[in-house]
Amino acid sequence: MSLRDCQAWKNAGLPLSTTSNEACKLFDATLTQYVKWTNDKSLGGIEGCLSKLRAADPTFAMGLAISNGLVLVGTGTSVALDKDLALAVKTMVELSQTQTLTPREQLHVSAVEMFAKGNFPRACDLWEQILRDHPTDMLALKFSHDAYFYLGYQEQMRDSVARVYPFWTPDIPLNSYVKGIYSFGLMETNFYDQAQKLAKEALSIEPTDAWSVHTVAHVHEMRAEIKDGLEFMQQSEGHWKDSDMLACHNYWHWALYLIEKGDYEAALTIYDSHILPSLQASGTMLDVVDSCSMLYRLQMEGVPLGQRWQTVLPVTQKHTRDHILLFNDAHFLMASLGARDLQTTRELLTTLQEASKSPGENCQHQLAKDVGLPLCQALLEAENGNPDRVLELLLPIRYRIVQIGGSNAQRDVFNQLLIHAAMTCTSSVHKNVARSLLMERDALKPNSPLTERLIRRAAAVHLMQ
């Protein structure tokens, strides 16, 4: 892989304010691994590259922006929780004010600063400003893509890439990966055919592109194409299993097909062999939510989980007071409820309530009162056997849950929760809710074995008449 030096970045119309060729190449190496979702051992992994990058030029603004940005976009910590990170962001901003940076670099620094404050929409505006003038700025494209994902801004996630896609000609490094990034936004906005076509194009150029594999997995999931999905994951596994940052999530998609089929043993085997080990090795947020989401789905299906929640709890417990993403919070709560840890549950809910009272410019804390807290409360009520209360909490906000971010497939766990609650509620006010929700689900995703199972169960207790 030929990494770009100072001159190469300049030639690309993306000059970097450093005289160190080494720093420029390490910036490229870090960016490449981020885009590929893979820590490349031959490059020393992202961590290795970042520490060498800091050594090569400690005041390199774009080096600091990618370094701080990656930590923040990981959503495993924040400036409120980590003093070193807070200092690193502050130092980055101060250094940028003493240097003569290009307007593009200055915007990058400001965007990371905004993201650090929890103001994701403003950060995205700044990244978009960069992309208008520099459509091949991959860092702005990827950071904004991730932030839109956290915001549940699905159209923006798609259109952000549509606006720059024509500029990514085959001679530009990483150009095929832009197809995969674009395909994901298309898929999340229900352009399934177009999404699949682009993802397959990307895979024909670079078969190890785990994010494009991930788009195809989503398309099969959303269309309930279980057989095709399973075949695709089996055939492509050799290509994506070494993408250490996304392999666990692709295995999660594989397991979703098995849960859909009702093949719970096979799903648990994937959980035990791939998802849990990945969680224990990395502790990254994506691996955490994959574990919690999968166990919760199996639990709703009545599958005995043994001590699996207790194994996840030590990882989620550390993040009880984080409140970085409401989507993450809801999944941490699943773990403390599943492990019957009342103290952690209470702590998560009380500290989230506190955060919602003085949100400042933090978009997640602003959303906590109307969406995050009712959603978390609904999980608690479900655990306490109060299905009517679950419906009272979730029905008014069900079309707002998208605002907590995540994908349609990931948030489907909350649709399933609502249906399960509706099937066991006793209030006459709610008597036809289960039927309505099941009809809607069947219309949107026909031939889903999971939906068919739920309809059979509902019909057996006369809820479908």
From Swiss-Prot:
Keywords of this entry: Repeat, TPR repeat
InterPro entries according to UniProt: TPR-like_helical_dom_sf (IPR011990), TTC38 (IPR033891)
PANTHER family from the UniProt entry: TETRATRICOPEPTIDE REPEAT PROTEIN 38
Similarity remark: Belongs to the TTC38 family.
Name used for this protein in its record: Tetratricopeptide repeat protein 38
Spans of repeat TPR: 104-137, 176-209, 248-281
